[in-house]
C-alpha cells in the first residue's frame, strides 16, 4: 500500500484517478493474496490456498469477460440466491474484490487527507473513549443536541455516483456497478444493509463502501450546517455593520425589561457547532435558539432527499434540549447536570466569595441492562443472583478463569469513566461468584472448597490489572471523585453494544 502511494507521483494516470491500469499489476494481487491468506486461517494446507491464487492472465480474462457481457452481468454464474455461499467461497472472486478494494483505497487515502486538512478543528481519533472525553469538554456549553442516524439502505447507483465524482475511469465504474447490482439481486430489501456493509466474507470491501458513503455525507453535511448557523447575520440586512447594530441594541436598555424578548437576545450571541460520530450514529451539538434547531432539522431532511435521493425517516433525527433530557450514546446514559462552585477572589485586602454554577456531562453505565444481558447469557438469574455457567464446565480451570477475567476487565475498562462505579463492583461480585460456582459444579464440590483451594488465584489477574490501571491514573482519594477514560479502547464493549441496539430499536418504534 505504501509503495503504491509513493509511486503515485510517477504515474500521471493515477493522479487523474484512472484506476483501471492498477488491476493489471501482479504485485497488487500479491497484496490481495496475502490478506486473503490471513483471513482464511490455517484450516487448509498452504499448497491448496496458493493453488487458487489468480495469475496475471486470469485477472485480465476475468475483467475482459465482465466488460463484454450485455444486460445484467452475472458474477455468480447463476441468479439463484441459494448459491451465494458457493460464490463467497470462490477464491477467484475474492482476490479480484481484494485487488479492486486496494486500488480504490490508494486513491481515497489522499482524498481523505485533503478533506481533513481543509476542515478546521476536524480530528480523527482511534480510541472510542476520545469521543467521551471530547463530549465532556464541549457538550456542557451547548444547549441543544440533534441525534442523527445515518441511513444505511443505500442504492447501488448512489454509491456509483459517489465514486464517479472523483474516479474518471469508466471501466472501473462499470466493474463496481456490476458487483453492487449483483449484491442487490442476491439479497432481499431487508438484508440490503448486510449485503453492502457487514458481509463477513467481504469485510474490507464492505467497510470501504460504508466509509466512502459516510465521508461523502460529512463532506457536504458539516459545511451545510455551518452555513445554516452563520446565516443568522443575514437577518440584519439593514445594518451593514453588526458591531454598530449591537451598540444600538445596548441603547435600548431604557425600555422596561418585560418588553424585551429573551429569544431576540439569543440571536445576538455567536452560535457554534460540535459534531461526533461512531458508526451510523452522529451527534450534532449546538448553542443557539430553538429556531436554529428547527432550521437544522429541516435542512437535514432535505439534504438526504436531494443529495442521495433517500427518504429520511423522522425517527432518524431527534432534537433534544440538554438541560431537560438525557440521551444514550456508546452504551452510556448521558445527561448535563448543573454543578455549583464556590470561588474565592482576593483583591488587595478584600476577600470575595462567589457562587458559580457550571454544567458538566455525566456518563452513567446501564447497570440494569448489563445485569439483564448477564442473565441472558446464564451468568445469573433475572433477579441478579449468580449461577454457574454450565456450558463452560467442560473447559479447563485456567480457561474458565481467563474467560471470566476478560469479561470483567473489558467491562471495567470500558465503563471506567462512568459516575456509578458502585454498580460496576456489584457486577464484579456477580461474576466472581458465578466463576466460583462454575468451578464447583465442574469438580462437584462447594464454593467454600473452591475458595480454599484457589485462594488468591481466583480472579487474581483481574485484581492486579485493576490496581495497575488505578495506580497509573490517579490516587485512591482522587479516584472517588474523578472519572478515568481509557484511551486504549478501540471499539465498543459487546454488552454496551447490545444495550445500545435495544435503545435504538425503542426510538425507532
From Swiss-Prot:
Q: Where in the cell is it found?
A: Plastid, Chloroplast
Q: What is its main location?
A: plastid
Q: Which GO terms describe its cellular component?
A: chloroplast
Question: Which keywords has UniProt assigned to this entry?
Answer: Chloroplast, mRNA processing, Plastid, RNA-binding, tRNA processing
Q: Which GO terms describe its molecular function?
A: RNA binding
| Any one biological process term the GO annotation gives | mRNA processing
What is this protein for, i.e. what is its function?
Usually encoded in the trnK tRNA gene intron. Probably assists in splicing its own and other chloroplast group II introns.
Per the record, the similarity remark reads: Belongs to the intron maturase 2 family. MatK subfamily.
This one is known as Maturase K
Name the gene behind this protein.
Answer: matK
Amino acid at each position: 500500500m505504501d509503495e503504491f502511494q509513493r509511486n503515485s507521483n510517477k504515474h500521471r494516470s493515477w493522479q487523474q484517478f484512472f484506476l483501471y491500469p492498477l488491476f493489471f499489476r501482479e504485485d497488487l494481487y500479491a497484496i490481495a493474496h496475502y490478506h486473503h491468506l490471513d483471513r482464511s486461517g490455517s484450516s487448509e494446507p498452504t499448497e491448496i490456498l496458493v493453488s487458487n491464487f489468480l495469475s496475471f492472465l486470469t485477472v485480465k480474462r476475468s475483467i475482459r469477460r465482465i466488460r463484454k457481457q450485455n444486460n445484467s452481468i452475472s458474477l455468480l454464474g447463476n441468479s439463484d440466491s441459494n448459491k451465494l455461499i458457493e460464490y463467497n467461497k470462490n477464491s477467484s472472486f475474492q482476490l479480484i474484490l481484494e485487488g479492486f478494494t486496494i486500488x480504490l483505497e490508494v486513491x481515497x487515502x489522499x482524498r481523505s487527507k485533503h478533506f481533513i486538512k481543509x476542515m478546521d478543528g476536524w480530528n480523527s481519533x482511534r480510541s472510542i473513549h476520545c469521543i467521551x472525553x471530547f463530549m465532556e469538554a464541549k457538550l456542557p456549553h451547548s444547549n441543544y443536541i440533534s441525534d442523527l442516524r445515518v441511513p444505511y439502505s443505500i442504492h447501488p447507483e448512489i454509491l456509483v455516483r459517489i465514486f464517479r465524482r472523483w474516479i474518471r475511469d469508466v471501466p472501473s465504474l462499470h466493474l463496481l456497478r456490476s458487483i453492487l447490482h449483483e449484491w442487490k439481486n442476491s439479497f432481499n430489501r431487508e438484508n440490503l444493509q448486510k449485503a453492502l456493509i457487514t458481509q463477513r466474507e467481504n469485510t474490507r470491501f464492505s467497510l470501504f463502501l460504508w466509509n466512502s458513503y459516510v465521508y461523502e455525507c460529512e463532506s457536504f453535511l458539516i459545511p451545510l450546517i455551518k452555513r445554516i448557523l452563520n446565516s443568522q447575520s443575514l437577518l440584519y440586512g439593514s445594518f451593514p455593520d453588526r458591531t454598530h447594530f449591537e451598540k444600538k441594541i445596548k441603547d435600548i436598555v431604557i425600555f422596561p425589561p418585560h418588553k424585551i424578548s429573551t429569544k431576540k437576545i439569543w440571536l445576538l450571541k455567536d452560535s457554534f457547532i460540535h459534531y461526533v460520530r461512531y458508526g451510523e450514529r452522529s451527534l450534532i451539538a449546538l448553542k443557539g435558539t430553538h429556531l436554529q434547531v428547527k432550521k437544522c432539522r429541516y435542512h437535514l431532511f432535505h439534504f438526504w432527499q436531494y443529495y442521495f435521493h433517500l427518504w429520511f425517516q423522522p425517527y432518524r433525527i431527534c432534537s433534544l434540549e440538554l438541560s431537560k433530557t438525557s440521551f444514550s450514546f456508546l452504551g452510556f446514559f448521558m445527561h448535563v447536570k448543573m454543578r455549583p462552585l464556590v470561588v474565592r477572589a482576593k483583591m488587595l485586602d478584600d476577600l470575595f466569595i462567589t457562587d458559580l454554577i457550571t454544567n458538566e456531562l455525566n456518563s452513567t453505565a446501564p447497570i440494569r441492562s448489563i445485569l439483564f444481558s448477564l442473565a441472558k447469557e446464564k451468568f445469573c438469574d433475572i433477579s441478579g443472583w449468580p449461577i454457574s455457567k454450565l456450558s463452560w464446565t467442560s473447559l479447563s480451570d485456567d480457561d474458565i478463569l481467563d474467560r471470566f477475567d476478560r469479561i470483567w476487565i473489558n467491562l471495567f475498562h470500558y465503563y471506567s469513566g462512568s459516575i456509578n462505579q458502585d454498580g460496576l463492583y456489584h457486577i464484579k461480585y456477580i461474576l466472581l461468584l458465578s466463576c466460583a460456582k462454575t468451578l464447583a459444579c465442574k469438580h462437584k464440590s462447594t464454593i467454600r472448597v473452591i475458595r480454599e483451594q484457589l485462594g488468591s488465584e481466583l480472579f487474581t489477574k483481574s485484581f492486579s490489572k485493576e490496581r495497575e490501571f488505578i495506580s497509573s491514573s490517579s490516587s485512591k482519594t482522587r479516584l472517588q471523585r474523578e472519572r478515568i477514560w481509557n484511551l486504549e479502547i478501540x471499539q465498543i464493549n459487546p454488552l454496551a453494544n447490545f444495550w445500545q441496539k435495544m435503545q435504538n430499536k425503542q426510538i425507532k418504534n
